[in-house]
Amino acid sequence: MNAFDVAIVGGGPAGSACAWKLRQSGLDVVVIDKAVFPRDKLCAGWITPQVLDDLDIDPNEYRQGRTFQAITGFRVGVIGNGDTVDASYGRAVSFGIRRCEFDHYLLCRSRARLRLGTAIASIRRDGSRWVIDEAISAPMLVGAGGHFCPVARMLDGSPDRAPRVAAQEVELPIDRKGCAVGGEAPELYFCPDFKGYGWCFRKGDYVNVGFGRVDWRALPEATNRFVTFLKTTGRMAADPSTWRWRGHAYLLAGFRQRRAVGDAVLLAGDACGLAYPQSGEGIRPAIESGLMAASTIVNASGRYTRDRLEPYGRQVRERFGSGMMGHLLSQLVPDGMSSGVALRLLDTPWFVRRIVLDRWFLHARDAALV
């Protein structure tokens, strides 16, 4: 049996950020993941400068040998309508990354001990310690394994009744003659009913195309309409019948978060259901919650009772709680009025820049973690 101070299930941004912070305090940490890194992880993949600050990442160091695309603007429109709004910032407000590179970098940088390629079969308590697969033990457990995290299932049960987003994505080597999307300006196209959006994002030698929707049953049909729209408007010339789509699901913050805290256990990132409800982005909430979890664990000084860990639960509710739900785009207008209102709102430069981009996608007004 290998003993550690903290066991983290999940090596994505939430788990890596938590491990990195815990290692700075001298704790012996193991990260367990069923994947072998670098892993094939599709994601629109842009991060704000705040993420770099939170993790003390030097952009010049990170970009050595990795994709790091400066984003200085966006193009926003409605699927089925040719009119768009171009918003230019004149400076880098986000950076495009490839998750296969970014996640591997964070995990290696954490300096945690790694158990990769390990699908967890059992988690149980033995006195004051958690025992994982009868091979690893630790007094403190963090679940950061995404939507289907086994720690989340153990702590909170099935999330099947909670509203969730379903998404499909594909990442392709770029055909510069067949892609009209500019590298510094990702393109976002919303459904007329505001219940989903598609994106087209060029990053270095790759382009990521994806579509996400709250109403998951309508996802295949809506995705087909989006892809057809990209072809008819000349944004993408590639034959979509050859694309290998990857699907995933996640919970939105503010609807029905999973229980984040138990005795000697915390959830972080998508395992806790923290994706931003407006954009579906999960990278920044994952990293912030991982750092918050680590600080709570350190402050608990080895006494991991639920009441000692509850400050983390309060932080999660305050930063990612129900206040976000009211900003969901689909709630702004009644269903019967959505199409016309969508066209008017998303054809208004002020609304696109100040609300859709600054507030919902860039979270420019969000306070930095202390």
Identify the role of each PLM range.
Residues 23-43:
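Glycine-rich FAD pyrophosphate-binding loop
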Residues 122, 217-297:
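FAD/FMN-dependent oxidoreductases across multiple families
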